[in-house]
A protein has these predicted regions:
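C-terminal segment of classical bacterial N-terminal signal peptides
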Residues: 17-21
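Kelch-like beta-propeller repeat domains
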Residues: 2-13, 24-344
Length: 344
């Protein structure tokens, strides 16, 4: 008798919309779908400002094409809006927001293989929908990470020109160099170099510190070609101490991945691998700084690399990226990791 009563109660609870919804919210993270981006592209570094997600530049398909597109996504309406284009088409241009403005730093000009890292920066006031030239980075930089902490901007790692006249992908080298920019003074300053020189990493800010994860290193072979080897390293920069610390590495080395922060944790998505075999990852992970531990998340519905991630509310939006290794399969895919109330 008691068993029948319990079964009836369970059926009644499952049939009650409110209670069912509450149960679904507490069940853990799940994937949903957002409106497709207006342009298929990859090598994206999005930023959030005033509840909107901004995406600029990128590689088109085929990868000889470079985008100057700039658009914003409003999660409240699930709509994309085209905005003023970049002054110059760029891919691997990194975005960060401070003082109500969007800053675009460096990136490559030119399609493959004629990539050329740039030192120029651009600044956009979304209210005016207009770009202007910013203060150049002290050195050409692309494929690094860029983020704002307490109204200062931090640019770390990536690739820079091996020689000033570099006009080819193979004429660039990985760097551990790091700099910060003060919008109030318009000056760039050197900060402590990162422990690891790498490109195609991802980063997010948690508790006023910059977490840099994954990516890859380009090793030159005897024939002059580059061998791209993924790294799993996780490092954190404390701007108050100007010091880096090494943390537990990712369970799996992923390059060309995306990262975002939520609830004091670091979330990472996707990426690709060139050696020992070529593959695109659907893997997603979350790292908790309080325990220095990683755990797996539900896999990306669509494996991608060169994608971007951005957090608004209790949702992480994972946008664009290439669906196959290399640069010829850019997408408009927009998938959303919905996090439970317990994780907000």
């Amino acid at each position: 008798m008691l068993r029948r009563d319990i079964l009836r109660l369970g059926a009644a609870l499952a049939a009650t919309p409110f209670l069912h919804s509450a149960h679904a919210q507490s069940a853990g993270p799940r994937w949903s779908t957002g409106a497709a981006a207006s342009v298929a592209r990859q090598e994206l570094y999005p930023e959030v400002l005033d509840g909107r997600i901004y995406v600029a530049g990128g590689l088109l398909t085929p990868n000889t094409g470079v985008s100057a597109h700039f658009e914003s996504y409003d999660p409240a309406t699930d709509r994309w809006t085209r905005l003023a284009t970049l002054p110059e088409a760029r891919h691997h241009i990194a975005l960060a927001a401070a003082g109500g403005l969007i800053y675009g730093a460096g990136g490559f000009s030119g399609g493959f293989p004629n990539w050329r890292a740039q030192a120029s920066t651009y600044v956009c006031d979304p209210r005016a929908d207009r770009w202007r030239d910013g203060v150049p980075i002290p050195y050409p930089a692309a494929e690094g990470v860029f983020a704002a902490i307490s109204q200062r901007l931090y640019l770390v790692g990536g690739r820079t020109r091996a020689v000033e006249g570099a006009r080819h992908f193979n004429e660039h080298v990985d760097t551990a160099r790091a700099v910060s920019f003060d919008p109030a003074t318009g000056h760039w300053s050197a900060i402590a170099d990162a422990p690891t020189a790498r490109n195609s990493a991802a980063a997010a800010v948690i508790g006023g510190r910059l977490y840099v994860v994954g990516g890859r290193q380009a090793a030159r072979q005897t024939d002059g070609s580059l061998r791209q080897v993924n790294v799993a390293d996780l490092e954190v920069y404390d701007p108050k101490a100007d010091r880096w610390s090494v943390l537990s590495p990712m369970p799996q080395a992923q390059g060309g991945l995306a990262a975002a922060a939520h609830g004091g944790c670091l979330y990472v998505f996707g990426g690709e691998q060139w050696v020992p075999e070529q593959k695109v990852f659907d893997s997603a992970w979350v790292y908790d700084p309080a325990t220095d531990r990683w755990r797996a998340l539900p896999s990306l519905p669509t494996p991608r690399h060169g994608l971007g991630a951005a957090t608004v509310g209790n949702r992480i939006h994972v946008i664009g990226g290439g669906t196959r290794v290399g640069g010829d399969h850019a997408s408009v895919v927009h998938e959303v990791l919905v996090l439970s109330d317990a994780m907000t």
